[in-house]
Design a protein with these regions (language model features):
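Alpha-helical transmembrane segments and their helix-start/interface "positive-inside/aromatic belt" motifs
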Residues: 21-35, 100-104, 226-239
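Short, intrinsically disordered terminal tails adjacent to the first/last structured region
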Residues: 1-19, 438-454
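Alpha-helical transmembrane segments of multi-pass membrane proteins
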Residues: 38-49, 180-185, 207-213
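Core segments of transmembrane alpha-helices
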Residues: 75-84, 174-178, 246, 327-339
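N-terminal membrane topogenic signal
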Residues: 19-30, 161-174
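Membrane-embedded catalytic scaffold of the fatty acid hydroxylase/desaturase
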Residues: 230-424
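Hydrophobic cores of alpha-helical transmembrane segments in multi-pass integral membrane proteins
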Residues: 27-55, 62-92, 102-120, 135-156
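Short, hydrophobic transmembrane alpha-helix segments
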Residues: 182-196
């Protein structure tokens, strides 16, 4: 009925009101990504029903059985068709405040239902089968995101930035909590660790990208296509491909090793402790190692040459979080992961650590307008990390924490001025190459304007 109501809305927009034509918000790109994610959900369930795929949840895990699967599948295909139509027709739609309000109200009711479902399901507060659906709930948040984006698209030119003011304060804690809660619920429901890890991170990242597009910290930090292509290559090749070849970093490999006898020789880890306590302890200890490795990257010139690849961008946004030289990434892994593998840390603990690590990392580098208040004394969030990327060397030599800021506070390197914001980010070298391969070799060919030991 919602879509029929929206379809009946009588609106005639002038060419200047066409959705997305002059907007800096990439509506179609955002909606397309969400559509692909939902299409993945629809296609994977019948595949695992026919073939056993170890990295994916079993057939029954994909739905709560509140509806017979044939009926559910037909509804999913209908929804997917509407989503595809929305992506294709978006540039030709006009603005309509009525359609926007209908979608917004529907979206918020949908949010309330799914949050209720998540809380009740995670803590076993009901025996009803509807509250067994961890995996479907994750994909319901994909649909919620689609509805909310479409709502804003229909009100383009009418919405005020102040409408998103609460996202400054709630965006970070809500998305971090949501990602972690979905992860714990999925593994509790029997989903494979790798699948639960990646899906939780993807859901959190979708939310971060939406936040930074609808309530950005700085318009000049919005990426262009020429920025996203090399960033995507860094994420795929450096963060996934190369670590896989080296048996480093990616959750799938770490989880495999964490469950093997090879890494349990030292097995001093307190496995009997509650899972959340183990994750918190791993975060605290790993941050100590990462703090000193990261600080060395800035204070020891040969290491800075490698790390400069990460700092070279003059913008901060979600997708350039993965911009690391392969050697830089390998060195960092040696400090924050290998010790825990050798100590025999359980695979669930390591997987949970990486969910927080990844979602916090995406948020940390995002262009989202964020105000964390007292949390800035605990986590290394966007407000703190932007100072770390400052072109002014005295400001950049601060806030080394990767996930937590506790060790910066202890060692006196925490920086968060109250009266101003960071001016420019980057390394000051305007000639630094932008292509993927050219950045890989840049440590050998390019100087940085501010050497860390000067």
């Amino acid at each position: 009925m919602l879509f029929l109501d929206v379809a009946r809305v009588d609106y005639k927009a002038s060419s200047s009101e066409k959705v997305g034509r002059n907007s800096r918000i990439p509506y179609r790109a955002l909606l397309s990504v969400l559509t692909v994610a939902f299409a993945f959900r629809i296609t994977m369930q019948p595949l695992v029903g026919k073939w056993q795929i170890s990295i994916l949840p079993s057939f029954d895990t994909w739905h709560s059985e509140a509806l017979p699967y044939p009926i559910l599948f037909a509804l999913q295909l209908l929804i997917l068709g509407i989503m595809i139509l929305g992506c294709l027709r978006l540039p030709h739609l006009g603005t309509s405040q009525r359609a926007s309000r209908v979608l917004a109200v529907t979206g918020w009711i949908y949010v309330a239902l799914m949050v209720k479902r998540l809380i009740i399901g995670l803590f076993d507060l009901s025996d009803h089968i509807w509250f067994d659906g961890a995996v479907p709930t994750a994909f319901h948040f994909v649909l919620i995101s689609y509805i909310m984006i479409m709502s804003h698209a229909f009100s383009e030119g009418k919405s005020k930035r102040s409408n998103f003011k609460l996202s400054r304060y709630l965006g970070y804690p809500v998305l971090i909590t949501l990602s972690m809660a979905l992860f714990f619920w999925m593994i509790k429901s029997g989903s494979p660790l790798t699948f639960a890890s990646y899906l939780s991170v993807l859901i959190g990242t979708f939310g971060i990208i939406i936040h930074e597009n609808f309530n950005s910290a700085r318009d000049e930090w919005r990426p262009e296509v020429k920025d996203l292509i090399p960033d995507g290559m860094f994420l795929i090749i450096v963060q996934v491909g190369i670590p896989a070849l080296l048996k480093f970093a990616i959750p799938a490999v770490i989880i495999t090793f964490a469950g093997s006898s090879f890494v349990t020789v030292l097995d001093f880890w307190p496995h009997e402790w509650p899972l959340l306590v183990q994750v918190a302890m791993m975060l605290l200890i790993a941050e100590f190692f990462r703090y000193w490795i990261h600080r060395s990257m800035h204070e020891f010139n040969p290491l800075w040459k490698l790390h400069a690849v990460h700092h070279a961008s003059d913008k901060l946004y979600t997708m350039n979080v993965g911009r690391f030289h392969p050697l830089d990434k390998t060195i960092q892994f040696l400090g924050d992961s290998l010790p825990f593998l050798l100590l025999g840390v359980g695979p669930e603990v390591i997987a949970a650590y990486f969910v927080f690590y990844a979602v916090n990392g995406f948020y940390q580098h995002s262009n989202a307008d964020v105000r964390l208040g007292f949390l800035n004394w605990i986590v290394a969030g966007p407000e703190l990390h932007r100072w770390h990327h400052s072109t002014i060397i005295s400001e950049g030599h601060a806030n080394y924490g990767n996930n937590l800021i506790i060790w910066d506070t202890f060692f006196g390197t925490r920086l968060l001025p109250k009266e101003r914001t960071v001016s420019e980010v980057g390394i000051g070298n305007k000639k630094w190459p932008r292509g993927f391969l050219s950045q890989i070799v840049a440590p050998l060919t390019q100087p940085t304007e501010h050497e860390p030991d000067k």
